[in-house]
Curated annotation (Swiss-Prot):
A lipid is attached at residue 15 (N-palmitoyl cysteine). This is Adhesin MafA 1/2. Residues 282-313 are annotated as: Disordered. It comes from Neisseria meningitidis serogroup C (strain 053442). One of its GO terms (biological process) is cell adhesion. GO terms for cellular component: cell outer membrane. A lipid is attached at residue 15 (S-diacylglycerol cysteine).
Length: 313
């Protein structure tokens, strides 16, 4: 049981995935990033069900979530180095014997018939020899494991690319055209199509285990769309969502490699909140209420010239 408890922090410490702040990167976007953004957006737009708009003239309104911001990542996971590093140091017992030289001093004193002799022995204050003896074993041991955590100091700034919105809008228009739906200016349209792009960006992440490492780059596109008939105010397409993500991943062993590189495109999680369950209030008197039929000539929002153009007059 003790061994298991020791192995758990050893295996789990510094093992995890650190997800960086989504960013387009500085300067030019590199090819893999372009490929992923294009793949996720194409897949999401391709999934849009536009069968209810067959033969109609649609005015397209696309709104994209802003993608500007910045953030800091400071510090990280604790290092296992501070947990198990230790040392053992053993010194044998040591005894030193010093030999100090001795010398005798004799003094004789005579005065008339009296005399005295004084003899003294003194030691020098510096040893003439020293003998050191050690008993026992001498040993030194140390053990430790150092793992660099995934939390470095980082500062990333997201740079918005205004051409991304134009690219996505052109993709939507292309799909409309290929489906046989004509996209026209608002004054010539009989249908309004609203597309709200909630998610349109990338996510970078790094997985660091003791033996396995991976670099992952994902691009996600999530959108919601609906269509309204201008004459009847009827919902031709109730709010629907389309969400796809593309991924590029490099896998390493002890950060050697990559031994595997993969690309995937798959359906992503839907929006956390969508408008598919919203219905009009039962007592509403608004003229633009969905499914409320009215005469265009009595609609103050539509001019006579607009009606004439719709009818081809």
């Amino acid at each position: 049981m003790k061994t298991l408890l020791l192995l758990i922090p050893l295996v789990l410490t510094a093992c995890g995935t650190l997800t960086g702040i989504p960013a387009h990167g500085g300067g030019k976007r590199f090819a893999v990033e372009q490929e992923l953004v294009a793949a996720s957006s194409r897949a999401a737009v391709k999934e849009m069900d536009l069968s209810a708009l067959k033969g109609r003239k649609a005015a397209l309104y696309v709104s994209v979530m802003g993608d500007q911001g910045s953030g800091n990542i400071s510090g990280g996971r604790y290092s296992i180095d501070a947990l198990i590093r230790g040392g053992y140091h053993n010194n044998p017992e040591s005894a030193t014997q010093y030999s100090y030289p001795a010398y005798d001093t004799t003094a004789t004193t005579k005065a008339d018939a009296l005399s005295s002799v004084t003899t003294s022995t003194s030691l020098l204050n510096a040893p003439a020899a020293a003998l050191t003896k050690n008993s026992g074993r001498k040993g030194e041991r140390s053990a430790g494991l150092s793992v660099n955590g995934t939390g470095d100091y980082r500062n990333e700034t997201l740079l918005a690319n205004p051409r991304d919105v134009s690219f996505l809008t052109n993709l939507i228009q292309t799909v409309f055209y290929l489906r046989g739906i004509e996209v026209v200016p608002p004054e010539y349209a009989d249908t309004d199509v609203f597309v709200t792009v909630d998610v349109f960006g990338i996510v970078r992440s790094r997985t660091e285990l003791h033996l396995y490492n991976a670099e992952t780059l994902k691009a996600q596109t999530k959108l919601e769309y609906f269509a309204v008939d201008r004459d009847s105010r009827k919902l031709l397409i109730a709010p629907k969502t389309a969400a796809y993500e593309s991924q590029y991943q490099e896998q390493y062993a002890l950060w050697m490699g990559p031994y595997s590189v993969g690309k995937t495109v798959k359906a992503s999680d839907r929006l956390m909140v969508d408008f598919s369950d919203i219905t009009p209030y039962g007592d509403t008197t608004a003229q633009n209420r969905p499914d409320f039929k009215q005469n265009n000539g009595k609609n103050p929002d539509v001019g006579n010239e607009v009606i004439r153009r719709r009818k081809g007059g």
